[in-house]
């Protein structure tokens, strides 16, 4: 194969003398690393930003290293299973998974399928994949909706696929060495032009016309320009940002773009006819990918460079709701997974409900988690009890998916108020996970953390401290001192130690943890927010009410902005702020805020939720003379 665009490389503006000729390949700094990786590993993933040159790098290395191998590229997720069978039948094959995120999810790639393909014929089959950095970050170890290590079950299959791959990072901005190598090809006008912009953009980014296409979209909103085309592109971009992994039909774009156009001014923008708008969006005056890629029969997707445009607003409800109403159950699962990862829990439950009703495998499990995370732990535990029963019958008691369902069931049993049962269940799970997965497996370590947490919540603080001390030692050795789970373990240990020990000493330990966490975590990271919340709680317990109230006020704002005002974490922090207001004499302000919090909480939390109990306790205190 001698045409890189057939492998998924973004087309470049045509050469004036040879319009179909691709730009010359310029060796990247990552070239040597990738060559070594493909010879040492059966599965290699190249990670970088849109238009960084990931696909071209993979294509050139594959052609060089595997010239006699068959090239097997499934064009969409439904074709993946057949592509794997084709790769198995070939004497030698490269399985090509450009934009790996499109092959993750229901009926998508799994570690077992890849392992069977690679291990049965070592060296005969190589899996080469690419993925945008933004997509990879969705699956990094993090816990948005809980802080003791179990959210990973919601997207374990996808994360395990990424962990199976040897990852090679590719920078978007070109190094001095890469620019020097490009100088040898500056006679090609496309390379010459790109070299003049390397102070702001990557060379491959310019060759693919990424900045020009983005500017064309932004400028098209002007009255009399192409405002309808811009609205169509906005709808297509947000379809991808909502989690849709397949092309959108022309009819969908015709329906979905109307609110975008209306929000910008509607008729005042002098919008062009729809057919003209579609032609503009697909050609965009550049001989590259266009703002939309596709055609009438196959559907359309937005150029992925646009997904990282600066200052994109959140996906509007009108698009999300309209898309979900039209989506197939499999699409709804993808949308629900992304919504859950993004803490849009109301949207997650709606999408996963649709997927579950449509019979999508695994939707029952993820739906139960989303329901519980939204503040209905008893309902989640009841649903997970059924999931556990089915998985034990179908997969056996020691299968990782069965153990994951036990983990989630035990967690929500504890969240519903039965900490003692949860601690016992996690103790049994630790033994089962150790036997089935190993003592150092992430699931085993997560179960140990939960066992310690609920042991402490059940009242045995001393045992919780002992368990957390042992866990922290093991995690630090396995994962290093800056791993988010190590930092989370330190926070839990400091908290439970403070309940029976010296509060001043615990506060000093927490101050050091804040310093360490700031070095390793982003300011909005959930672990960082949890550490700051514990710090504010210590300050309140030490009697510095005004200082604590100020910290809780800041945290309430940040968590509400990040998660939504009615997320359980945000509700709890808002209640802590009210408690601070009460302790500093702001009773009238506290009463007003508490009334609003109770209204918000009753809308999303199940009756008897511990946040509601806390709110009613504060209300009763405010009513005392």
Please state what every model-predicted region is:
Residues 73-76, 86-110, 114, 126-135:
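Conserved P-loop NTPase "ATPase switch" module shared by AAA+ and STAND
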């Amino acid at each position: 194969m001698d045409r890189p665009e057939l492998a998924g490389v973004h087309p470049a503006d045509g050469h004036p003398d040879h319009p179909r000729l691709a730009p010359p390949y310029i060796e990247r700094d990552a070239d040597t690393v990738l060559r070594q990786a493909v010879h040492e590993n059966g599965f290699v993933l190249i990670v970088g930003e849109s238009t960084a040159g990931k696909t071209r790098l993979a294509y050139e290395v594959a052609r060089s290293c595997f010239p006699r191998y068959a090239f097997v590229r499934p064009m969409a997720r439904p074709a993946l299973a057949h592509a794997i069978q084709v790769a198995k039948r070939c004497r030698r094959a490269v399985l090509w998974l450009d934009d790996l995120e499109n092959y993750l999810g229901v009926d998508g790639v799994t570690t077992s399928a890849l392992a069977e393909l690679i291990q049965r014929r070592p060296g005969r089959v190589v899996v080469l994949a690419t993925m945008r950095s933004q997509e990879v970050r969705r699956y990094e170890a993090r816990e948005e909706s809980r802080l003791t290590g179990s959210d990973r079950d919601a997207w374990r299959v996808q994360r395990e696929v990424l962990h199976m791959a040897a990852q090679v990072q590719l920078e978007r901005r070109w190094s001095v060495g890469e620019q020097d190598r490009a100088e040898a090809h500056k006679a090609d006008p496309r390379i010459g032009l790109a070299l003049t912009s390397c102070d702001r953009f990557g060379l491959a980014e310019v060759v693919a016309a990424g900045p020009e296409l983005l500017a064309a979209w932004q400028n098209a909103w002007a009255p009399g320009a192409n405002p309808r085309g811009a609205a169509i592109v906005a709808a297509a971009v947000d379809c991808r940002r909502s989690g849709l992994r397949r092309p959108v039909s022309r009819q969908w774009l015709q329906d979905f773009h109307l609110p975008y156009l209306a929000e910008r001014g509607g008729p005042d923008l002098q919008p062009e006819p729809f057919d003209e708008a579609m032609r503009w969006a697909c050609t965009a005056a550049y001989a590259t990918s266009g703002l939309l890629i596709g055609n009438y029969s196959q559907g359309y997707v937005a150029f992925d460079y646009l997904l990282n445009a600066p200052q994109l607003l959140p996906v509007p409800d009108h698009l999300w709701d309209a898309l979900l109403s039209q989506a197939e159950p499999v699409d709804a699962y993808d949308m629900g997974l992304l919504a859950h990862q993004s803490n849009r829990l109301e949207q997650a439950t709606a999408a996963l409900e649709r997927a579950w009703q449509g019979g999508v495998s695994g939707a029952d499990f993820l739906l139960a988690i989303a329901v519980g995370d939204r503040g209905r732990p008893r309902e989640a535990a009841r649903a997970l009890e059924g999931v556990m029963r089915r998985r034990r019958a179908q997969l056996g008691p020691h299968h990782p998916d069965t153990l994951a369902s036990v983990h989630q069931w035990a967690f929500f049993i504890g969240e519903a108020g039965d900490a003692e049962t949860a601690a016992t269940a996690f103790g049994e799970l630790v033994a089962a996970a150790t036997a089935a997965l190993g003592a150092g497996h992430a699931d085993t370590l997560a179960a140990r953390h939960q066992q310690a947490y609920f042991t402490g919540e059940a009242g045995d603080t001393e045992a919780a401290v002992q368990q957390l001390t042992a866990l922290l030692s093991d995690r630090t050795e396995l994962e290093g001192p800056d791993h988010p789970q190590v930092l989370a373990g330190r926070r839990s240990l400091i908290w439970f130690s403070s309940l029976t020990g010296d509060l001043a000493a615990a506060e000093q330990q927490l101050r050091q943890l804040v310093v360490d966490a700031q070095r390793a975590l982003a300011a909005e990271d959930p672990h960082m927010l949890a550490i700051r919340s514990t710090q504010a709680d210590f300050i309140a317990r030490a009697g510095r009410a005004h200082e604590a109230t100020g910290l809780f006020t800041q945290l309430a704002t940040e968590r509400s902005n990040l998660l939504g005002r009615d997320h359980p974490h945000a509700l709890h922090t808002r209640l802590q702020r009210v408690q601070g207001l009460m302790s500093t004499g702001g009773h009238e302000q506290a009463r007003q805020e508490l009334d609003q919090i109770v209204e918000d909480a009753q809308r999303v939390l199940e009756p008897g939720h511990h946040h509601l109990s806390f709110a009613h306790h504060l209300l009763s205190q405010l009513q005392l003379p």
